[in-house]
Amino acid sequence: MIPAEFPAILELNSNYACRSKCRRAFFFGAKQMTDAEILTLVDRLERCLLAKEEFHHRDHLSVAVVYLYACDLETAMDRMRSSLKRFASHHGVAGLYHETLTRFWLLQVEQRLDRRQCLEDSVRKAQEQLSDKNLAFEYYSRERIESKEARETWLEPDLKNA
């Protein structure tokens, strides 16, 4: 089931021709997701219908794109935080959520987001450009990013600006 507010995203995107030529293109060993599949992923995350093992880095990026299409940065951050905390709690790993990393990745997605593109192209672009999970270590020292404070609150990068 696709959340009620998300059809507006599809409507917004219908104004722009999707530049993806091959919906079956393989990326990270999985086919490129369609708009409906992306929105279903968000719905399944929000309703905790995904197994913990089903939600990977590329899925975090997909959700970030959807939230940033639907809302401003702070509202998207609130939704991302809420969804991830609920998901982690549901799977018995409530302490897994990391505020600094969540905001870092959301900012990285926002910087690359072109809302004139269709949703699936934006997701594909985010997944291609932000596939390296270690990117955060170009901005943060290991000590800083692994601190309790970074897990609980937003910390500015200590190596270079995000």
Q: Model regions: which residues?
A:
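Aromatic (phenylalanine/tyrosine) cluster motif
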Residues: 6, 16, 26-28
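Leucine-biased recognition of intrinsically disordered, low-complexity hydrophobic segments
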Residues: 10-12
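Intrinsic-disorder-associated interaction segments
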Residues: 31-34, 116
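Intrinsically disordered, low-complexity serine/threonine- and proline-rich regulatory segments
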Residues: 33-50
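Conserved, aromatic- and glycine-enriched, well-ordered alpha/beta core segments
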Residues: 48-118
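A charged, amphipathic interaction segment
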Residues: 98-162
